[in-house]
């Protein structure tokens, strides 16, 4: 399931392209569900061979529209005309609001369909940077200083917002929409003029934003895989050649060095992996997250954020980290499918009467 009515629609398409190429069509029957940028749902024909380009995944022309009022019947048809097998697992490859924020996960929960990745709570907490940071603070995880603002506050008292940032965080700082990923709408600010423009830009994408102090150090990432007993991958380092790791560097020109494995000490790896699992549990994660850290110039490890649906594009860090740990791309996908089935089976044992 991919696409979506989101600023990260194209990111989702790139992720879906990579995943469909890696899936073993002899082992899996792949049914594409495409959500257009207008929010329309299209079901495509069974994929019998790897998809070669993104246009083949955009199903406006060769897909079949269906209404959400008939989800059980139309969205998940029989696996084939000759058998009554239900869909085994849904793999949501949706990024951003309405995709990795718990909404699609809630829909799949209502349908009682197994799905890959985090549940409603973890997805929504992982999408909202403000809530995420509150949970990290409660879990005792060290992180950069931050402040949150609503669009209402900005419109009513802009000077007060700017003064609060300057007093509590200083420059440089980063302004981000609270509920968006892939570095969309993010700005680095070195002065008040840039800060004011950054507020305006971020509020174009969300009604709530977060401002974080700038941290001098390295950007370190690690993959987490599992349910109640998660494990960690190798660590990687992001070294953007631009001022910071923005959307263009992530998905377009690849103008970023990904160093895998990152050069860290055994003690630092142990601390990063321990904090990553602690962050995973703080949001009640399942399936997968990519945990992002800062390693400051004085050696301190700070949690930045977790991504509950990290990209699977050719430039993406998550699958590369697991490849370094000895898990290839196809095997990684199969493990995620098994984790989804495991978590779903566990939920079926829960009592709903008393």
Curated annotation (Swiss-Prot):
Cell compartments where the protein resides? Cytoplasm
UniProt-annotated binding residues for Mg(2+) 1 = 292, 305
- Give the catalytic activity: 2 D-alanine + ATP = D-alanyl-D-alanine + ADP + phosphate + H(+)
Q: Which Pfam families match?
A: Dala_Dala_lig_C, Dala_Dala_lig_N
Gene3D superfamilies under this entry? Answer: 3.40.50.20, ATP-grasp fold, A domain, ATP-grasp fold, B domain
Keyword list (alphabetical) reads: ATP-binding, Cell shape, Cell wall biogenesis/degradation, Cytoplasm, Ligase, Magnesium, Manganese, Metal-binding, Nucleotide-binding, Peptidoglycan synthesis
Q: Provide the ATP-grasp domain boundaries.
A: 133-338
Task: Identify a single GO molecular function assigned to this protein.
Answer: metal ion binding
Its domain of life reads: Bacteria
Q: How is the cofactor bound?
A: Binds 2 magnesium or manganese ions per subunit.
Is this entry keyworded S-adenosyl-L-methionine? Answer: no
Binding-site list for Mg(2+) 2 = 305, 307
**Pathway it works in:** Cell wall biogenesis; peptidoglycan biosynthesis
Which cofactors, if any, are listed as required?
Mg(2+); Mn(2+)
Q: Does the keyword Ligase apply?
A: yes
Annotated positions binding ATP: 166-221
GO cellular-component term (any) = cytosol
InterPro entries in alphabetical order: ATP-grasp (IPR011761), ATP_grasp_subdomain_1 (IPR013815), D-Ala_lig_Van_CS (IPR000291), D_ala_D_ala (IPR005905), Dala_Dala_lig_C (IPR011095), Dala_Dala_lig_N (IPR011127), PreATP-grasp_dom_sf (IPR016185)
| One GO process term, biological-process aspect | cell wall organization
In the Enzyme Commission scheme, what number(s) does this protein have?
6.3.2.4
Enzyme class, one word? ligase
Family, according to the entry, reads as follows: Belongs to the D-alanine--D-alanine ligase family.
Matching entries from PANTHER family are given as: D-ALANINE--D-ALANINE LIGASE (PTHR23132), D-ALANINE--D-ALANINE LIGASE A (PTHR23132:SF25)
Its biological purpose: Cell wall formation.
Entry protein name: D-alanine--D-alanine ligase
| Source species of the chain | Bacillus velezensis (strain DSM 23117 / BGSC 10A6 / LMG 26770 / FZB42) (Bacillus amyloliquefaciens subsp. plantarum)
Gene assigned in the entry: ddl
């Amino acid at each position: 399931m991919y696409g979506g009515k989101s600023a990260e629609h194209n990111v989702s398409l790139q992720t879906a392209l990579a995943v469909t190429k890696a899936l073993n069509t002899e082992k899996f029957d792949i049914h594409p569900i495409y959500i257009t940028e207008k929010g329309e749902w299209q079901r495509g024909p069974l994929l019998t061979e790897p998809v070669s380009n993104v246009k083949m995944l955009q199903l406006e022309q060769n897909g079949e529209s269906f209404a959400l009022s008939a989800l059980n019947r139309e969205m998940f048809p029989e696996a084939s005309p000759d058998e009554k097998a239900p869909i085994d697992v849904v793999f949501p490859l949706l990024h951003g609001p309405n995709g990795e924020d718990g909404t699609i996960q809630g829909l799949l929960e209502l349908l009682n369909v197994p799905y890959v990745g985090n549940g409603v709570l973890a997805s929504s907490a992982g999408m909202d940077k403000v809530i995420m940071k509150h949970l990290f603070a409660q879990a005792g995880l060290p992180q950069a200083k931050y402040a949150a603002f609503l669009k209402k506050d900005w419109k009513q008292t802009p000077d007060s917002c700017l003064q609060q940032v300057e007093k509590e965080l200083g420059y440089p700082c980063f302004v981000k929409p609270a509920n968006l990923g892939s570095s969309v709408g993010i700005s680095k600010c070195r002065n008040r003029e840039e800060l004011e423009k950054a507020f305006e830009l971020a509020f174009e994408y969300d009604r709530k934003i977060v401002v974080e102090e700038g941290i001098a150090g390295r950007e370190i990432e690690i993959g987490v895989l599992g349910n109640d007993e998660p494990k960690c991958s190798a660590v990687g380092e992001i070294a953007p050649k631009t001022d910071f790791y923005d959307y263009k560097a992530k998905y377009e020109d690849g103008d970023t060095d990904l160093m895998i494995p990152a050069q860290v000490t055994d003690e630092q790896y142990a601390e990063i992996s321990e904090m990553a699992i602690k962050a995973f549990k703080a949001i009640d994660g399942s399936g997968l997250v990519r945990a992002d850290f800062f390693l400051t110039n004085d050696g301190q490890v700070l949690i930045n954020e977790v991504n509950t649906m990290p990209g699977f594009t050719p430039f993406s860090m998550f699958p590369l980290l697991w490849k370094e740990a000895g898990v290839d791309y196809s095997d990684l996908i199969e493990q995620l499918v098994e984790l989804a089935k495991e978590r779903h089976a566990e939920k079926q044992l829960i009592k709903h009467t008393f």
